[in-house]
Every structure is written in structure tokens, then in C-alpha cells.
Amino acid sequence: MIRIVDDIEEKQRITRSILTALPEWFGIPESTENYIRESANEIMVASFEEEKANGFLCLKETGKDTVELAVMGVLKTHHRKGIGRDMFDKAKRIAAEHSYSFIQVKTVQMGKYPEYDETNRFFLGLGFKEFELMPNLWDKWNPCQIYVMSL
């Protein structure tokens, strides 16, 4: 079941449980804590199986016309089951209902790490387009690829 999560403590609990289970993508403790903290003030869409979250994503406004897919995670045991796509479809509808024109997402550039190559292919498969590469936004080992989608 995919649903919106409004409760601040539940948002942070879900974010912590999913991100700490995905160290290949979220292995920097300070960054993970930042995602957990910021999730409290973002729109959260989560996937549940028997009342237990197995995935989530958060949307954050970055401009009056643009929302960012700020963070997303699906437990590895649930990868390739359509959960990420289903959550994104709901988030995309929510963004359109809030009159946003664009949705963006940032990830590590394709070709740097196998896990992030999977992430890049996922976003491209959803219909995102390459917008800009910012090689020094994070650090030289993690060049930031920005993808964008028109709503």
C-alpha cells in the first residue's frame, strides 16, 4: 500500500529505518542524519507491507515552480518489484496537484559506482532527462547529476 505520511515522528522513523538499511547509498552518517532531520518538513510518500514501511520518498520545494525528489529509498529485498515506480507515480500526481511545473532529482553521475548506475537507470526509466552535471557540488569523487522532468 502506498500512502502519504503526515506525522513528523513517523516520517523520521521511516527515513531512519530505510536509509540505515541501505549503506551502499547512504553510508555517510552526517548526510543520513540530515535526510532524517529534513524529512520532517517534506512531503513523504511511503510504501507499506503489513503496516511496515519498505520504501519512501520525500519531496521538497526548491522554487515556486519546482519540487525536488529530495531522498528516496526502498529496502533491497523489495528492489525491482515496482515499489519505487509506484511511489514516484503518486508523488508526481501530488506535485502536479500542488501546481508545480517541474520535478528534479540529484544523484551521483553515471559511471562512478555500480549502485548509483542502478539509480541513474531508474530515474531515466521514469522519464527524467539529464539537466546539468555539477562535478564539484558534493566532491570530486561524487559528481552531481541533476535530472529534471516536466509535469
Task: Tell where the protein language model's regions lie, with residue ranges.
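Short amphipathic alpha-helix that is part of the acyltransferase structural core
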Residues: 1-30, 48
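Active-site rim helix/loop that mediates acceptor-substrate recognition in acyltransferases
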Residues: 23-49, 56-58
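Conserved beta-strand in the GNAT
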Residues: 46, 52-60, 66-73
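Conserved acetyl-CoA binding element of GNAT-fold acetyltransferases
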Residues: 65-76, 80, 104-106
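Conserved acetyl-CoA-binding loop-helix of GNAT-fold acetyltransferases
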Residues: 80-97, 118-121
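Conserved GNAT acetyl-CoA-binding A-motif
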Residues: 95-114
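Short glycine/proline-centered loop/turn elements that form peptide/ligand docking sites
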Residues: 114-119, 133-143
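Conserved acetyl-CoA-binding loop of GNAT-fold acetyltransferases
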Residues: 120-132
